[in-house]
Every structure is written in structure tokens, then in C-alpha cells.
Amino acid sequence: MATNIRKTHPLFKIINNSLIDLPTPTNISIWWNFGSLLGLCLIIQILTGLFLAMHYTADISSAFSSVAHICRDVNYGWLIRNIHANGASLFFICIYLHIARGLYYGSYIYKETWNIGVIILLLLMATAFVGYVLPWGQMSFWGATVITNLLSALPYIGDMLVQWIWGGFSIDNATLTRFFTFHFLLPFIIAALTMVHLLFLHETGSNNPTGLDSNMDKIPFHPYYSYKDLLGFFILLLLLTLLALFMPYSLGDVENFIPANPLVTPPHIKPEWYFLFAYAILRSIPNKLGGVLALAFSILILLLVPMLHTSKQRNLTFRPITQLLFWLLVTNTIILTWVGGQPVEQPFITIGQIASITYFSFFLILFPLAGWWENKMLNL
């Protein structure tokens, strides 16, 4: 009998074991689609980014005009730029939903997969931040100034570190050039880490909505889940097309249509919408170093989630108290996002401070406490 090449060829065998004959739980829901959607987002971002890089000039005197040139003179340049800019927003929507699913269904129990995922998130945030600086508009310049300046809060090495990142004593040509380099390089590192993420995931197999062992009830990934993923792809591409064609600038900041001017500060400096929750946490602490540490910890706290898991059950399907806390955390994060986009005045300062305290309380106190309490109730 002839052997199947996909099962014997060294390269095809890897693809086959990852995407075709992969044993997958029968009951994974639509929430498990976001991993593949993130892969699609990454491919779209790399491809559109490559085409934009062909026409972009990383020089402060011509960066803004090169972006205008892309939108006006390059064939379908406006479309490529709109897809790239709005693709970033969809990328973050997908990754936040992916993380939320991981928290809800206890996927963080697979520590290696989870930790690599957090590193990917940090790199994605770094990529988006340096990418936002490239058009060299007002918000690009001042956003970069404010965020990089935060590093000066670090004792002893702070000022030296800021000047090292800037490549001088202020944000200048050297800064833009290196940010462009990082923006070009980081997505490929993210792609490599995605492979490691999948490697660790396939060591254990996928989690499922029940949180129970599913080894006795699995089906091949193709055709069942490959077609399911394909449906997700079509929905994502439809949303991206609608965003890019009908409301391309709805998620951006109007200040970025003004070329960067170091002499004029925008009335309200703020990052893109997907960083606003972390920005609100940063602003809610009056001390500069404290704010920087809170900002870093708002993401790094995800690394503590597996260690703070106290429940005997893996997911929240049959844990009503923790379920309530989870949805309160989601609401809290939305409130932080809203506050981050508001000016620094009352009542937003107080709301931001309360929301920041509760954000950390959920992870460090309330979730572990609720898990312990539910264990006690199970023993009654």
C-alpha cells in the first residue's frame, strides 16, 4: 500500500500533526477560534506592513509626507494603510478576547503556553507603540515623548536609559529610524514565538469548555475545525473590510492629521484605544515611578494567574461566584478604557483610581478568595 506523503515527509509531517490530523476535543466552542484569527491578523499585518515599508521614509522631514504620498499617489496605498491601521485594532480585539477566554476556561493551567502568550502580548504592545510613532503626526510625537519619558522614573539608570532609547537628548531622527527598525523586526519575532506557543499547546492538547480530560473524545482538526476557522476568517475579513472602507479613521486620533510639532502640545495626549486601560492605571497613581510600575504590572499580573489559582475546578462554567467576578473584571477594564480617554480632571481621576484598585484586587485577592470559598461550599 502506498504511504501518504503528508505522514512521512519530514516537513509535511509537522504541518500534518499541527493542522490536519491533530486530535482536537469535540466540544470546543467559537471562543477557541481566536487563536487562528490572531494568526490571520499577524499575516495581514506583516503583508500590508511590507508594502507600506516599500514607500515609507523613516526621516522626520519626510515621514509625514511619505504617509500622505502612500494614501494619495501609490496604487491602492490608501487601502493598504487603512487595512494596516484598522488591522491593528482588530488584532488587539482578538487578543483581548483570546486572553479573556483563557481566564474564563482556565487555559492558564498550561503554564508554558500561557507564559509565552503573555510575552507575545508584551511584544505586540511594543510593536503597536513604535508603529504609532511612524506617521510622525502630533499624537505620534507627543505619545512617544510621554511614554519613553516614563523610563526616566527608574532610579539611577532612568535618564541614561531614555537618552539611549532616543539616540540623543530629545526625540529626533535617530528615534524615528530605530522605531521603524523595531516595528519591522518585532512582528517576525512574534511569528517565531507563535510557533513556540503552538508547540507547547500541542504538547498538552487543547483545553475545552468543560475543563475535563477529553482524551477519550477527540476528532481530527481537518475538516471539522479547519472549516470552522474558515468561517471565523470570513467574519474577521468582513469586519476589517467594513472598517477600512467605510470608517477608516474612526478608531484613530484627529491630532495625527497634524504634522509633529515639538513647540505645540496637543490639549490631551493619549495612546490608541487598545492601550487606554493601562494608560488609565498609569495616570491614577500620583507618583511617577509608582505609575510606571503599575503600568507594567497591569500586564505582568497575567503571569501570576496560574500561581493564584485556588479552585478545585479548572474553569468558571460551574463557579457562579467567580463567574460574577470575571464579568465585573471585564466591566472594570471597559471603565478603565473609557477613563483613559478622558481629560485628567474630576470625576475621572477618582473613577480611575477606584477602577485601578479593583483591577488589581480581582487578580490578587478576589479570584483566589472566591476559589477557596467555592471549594469550601463543595465540601458541605
Swiss-Prot record:
Its main location: mitochondrion. Heme b b566 binds at H98, H197. GO terms for biological process: mitochondrial electron transport, ubiquinol to cytochrome c. Binds 2 heme b groups non-covalently. A ubiquinone binds at H202. One of its GO terms (molecular function) is metal ion binding. GO terms for cellular component: mitochondrial inner membrane; respiratory chain complex III. It is a multi-pass membrane protein. Component of the ubiquinol-cytochrome c reductase complex (complex III or cytochrome b-c1 complex) that is part of the mitochondrial respiratory chain. The b-c1 complex mediates electron transfer from ubiquinol to cytochrome c. Contributes to the generation of a proton gradient across the mitochondrial membrane that is then used for ATP synthesis. Belongs to the cytochrome b family. This is Cytochrome b. It comes from Urogymnus polylepis (Freshwater whipray). The lineage of its organism: Eukaryota, Metazoa, Chordata, Craniata, Vertebrata.
